[in-house]
Regions:
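Active-site beta-loop-alpha junctions enriched in small/polar residues
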Residues: 11-15, 59-61, 85-87, 122-125, ...
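An active-site-proximal "capping" alpha-helix that borders the catalytic cofactor pocket
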Residues: 100-109
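Active-site flanking residues adjacent to catalytic metal/cofactor-binding acidic residues
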Residues: 8-10, 82, 142-144
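Short, well-ordered coil/turn segments that N-cap beta-strands
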Residues: 2-6, 50-54, 75-79, 113-118, ...
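Active-site beta->alpha N-cap acidic-glycine motif
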Residues: 1-76
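Active-site-adjacent pocket scaffolds in enzyme catalytic domains
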Residues: 110-111, 115-193
C-alpha cells in the first residue's frame, strides 16, 4: 500500500479554555479534565499503533498543570506547538500581554522539549493586529489559526486594512507560513455543543 501524507493536530486545552472564560466551577473543569485523563492516553495509543506523528498545540497553563501528560506527548515524538497561556484570544490582549503570553508559554515548551515552539495556533483561531509581528520577532516559522485555504499552506499577510464602508486593502506577505485550519474539520463544535 502506498504512503499517504496527512497533517493531524490536537489542541490540548485541558481546563485552560474554561478558565479563560471564567468558568471555574466543577462542571466546566470536569469537561476540561476529560482530555488529559481519558482522551490523551487513547489518542497516544492510536497514534503509536499506526505510527502517525502529530502536532499538539498546548497552552502554557496546560503544560504547567499536566506536566506528566505533556511529557508523554513529547516522549512519543510529537511536535509541541504554542497555544497561548490560558486560552485567551490575542485580540483581547494588549501587545505587552500578548508578548508576555508568547514568552511565558515558550519558556514552558523549552523546559519540556529543549527548544522553542516553531508553530503557533491562536487560542481563538484569530490573530490580533500585533500577532504576526510578535510571532516573527519570536522566531515562529508557521501559524495555524486562519482559514484562507482548505489545506494548502500560504504566506501570512501583515497590514491588512479592513473597513466597513470601503474595499479591503490587503497587506504584504511575510515569511510566516499559514497551515490553514477549518471548523468543519475540528471535533470541538461537534462534541461540545
Amino acid at each position: 500500500m502506498g504512503r499517504h501524507i496527512v497533517c493531524i493536530t490536537f489542541d490540548f486545552d485541558a481546563i485552560s479554555g474554561w478558565i479563560a472564560r471564567g468558568m471555574t466551577t466543577p462542571g466546566p473543569i470536569s469537561r476540561g479534565e476529560f482530555g488529559p485523563n481519558v482522551a490523551l492516553p487513547r489518542i497516544l495509543a492510536l497514534l503509536r499503533k499506526y505510527d502517525v506523528p502529530a502536532s499538539w498545540f498546548i497552552p502554557g497553563h496546560t503544560l504547567e498543570t499536566y506536566p506528566e501528560q505533556c511529557r508523554q506527548v513529547c516522549a512519543a515524538g510529537h511536535e509541541i506547538g504554542h497555544h497561548g497561556w490560558t486560552h485567551r484570544p490575542p485580540a483581547s490582549l494588549s501587545r505587552e500581554q500578548e508578548e508576555d503570553e508568547l514568552t511565558r508559554t515558550n519558556e514552558q515548551i523549552i523546559k519540556l522539549t529543549g527548544r522553542g515552539a516553531r508553530g503557533y495556533r491562536s487560542p481563538a483561531w484569530d490573530l490580533s493586529p500585533h500577532s504576526v509581528d510578535l510571532l516573527l520577532q519570536h522566531g515562529f516559522v508557521y501559524d495555524s489559526s486562519m482559514m484562507g485555504d482548505d489545506y494548502t499552506p500560504y504566506r501570512v499577510r501583515r497590514g491588512d486594512i479592513i473597513e466597513l464602508e470601503k474595499p479591503a486593502v490587503f497587506g504584504r506577505q511575510t515569511r510566516l507560513i499559514e497551515m490553514p485550519i477549518s471548523w468543519s474539520l475540528d471535533d470541538f463544535p461537534h462534541f461540545e455543543f
